[in-house]
Amino acid sequence: MEFRLVDLKTWKRKEYFTHYFESVPCTYSMTVKLDITTIKTGKAKLYPALLYAVSTVVNRHEEFRMTVDDEGQIGIFSEMMPCYTIFQKDTEMFSNIWTEYIGDYTEFCKQYEKDMQQYGENKGMMAKPNPPVNTFPVSMIPWTTFEGFNLNLQKGYGYLLPIFTFGRYYEENGKYWIPLSIQVHHAVCDGFHTCRFINELQDVIQSLQNHGGDEE
């Protein structure tokens, strides 16, 4: 994994970054419905399929891989991996597990299953310890669907990485849908970039229809 520093003097986005990071700090969230019919009617497991799809599109675009390091320098990770929530039924609290991103869907799912088997019973916020710096957060709230969702972060104006939150899927008119909230920083990500992400994410989900696995 490489962390490439951004040269602010020559960066084409310098004016926008300065405006939305310093002058008028601004984050925003967008909630959309994704068609997951191909996943639900196929044999793919839902959660790893969604994690793979989100990670694939995150790794396509630099604006979703930018952060500020410990020295206050802005840079871009060469690759990101998901750090996602799992629910602990006995404590009614969640834990986080991270899984290495692998471009091959089948291999990614195998790594997901391996992590779940090894760390899924661990308690605490980090069921799988020592998360790398190049992880991004994904949450699943499977108990209800929603049409709007946003996070209120006290220090969110300094956080550049995207945050993804899925809700409960539902069936409507013969199709399966799931809500997804995407929270981003306007300093690095405009509406165009978020909409492109959503459109590409839907395409990746559609492409998973021919992949097998145990249904979840």
Swiss-Prot record:
It is an enzyme of class 2 (transferase). Homotrimer. It comes from Vibrio anguillarum (Listonella anguillarum). This enzyme is an effector of chloramphenicol resistance in bacteria. Keywords: Acyltransferase, Antibiotic resistance, Plasmid, Transferase. It catalyses: chloramphenicol + acetyl-CoA = chloramphenicol 3-acetate + CoA. Its EC number is 2.3.1.28. The active site is at residue 186. PROSITE patterns: CAT. Belongs to the chloramphenicol acetyltransferase family. GO terms for biological process: response to antibiotic. The keyword Transferase applies. GO terms for molecular function: chloramphenicol O-acetyltransferase activity. The gene is cat. Gene3D superfamilies: Chloramphenicol acetyltransferase-like domain. The keyword Acyltransferase applies. This is Chloramphenicol acetyltransferase. InterPro entries: CAT-like_dom_sf, Chloramphenicol_AcTrfase_AS, Cmp_AcTrfase.
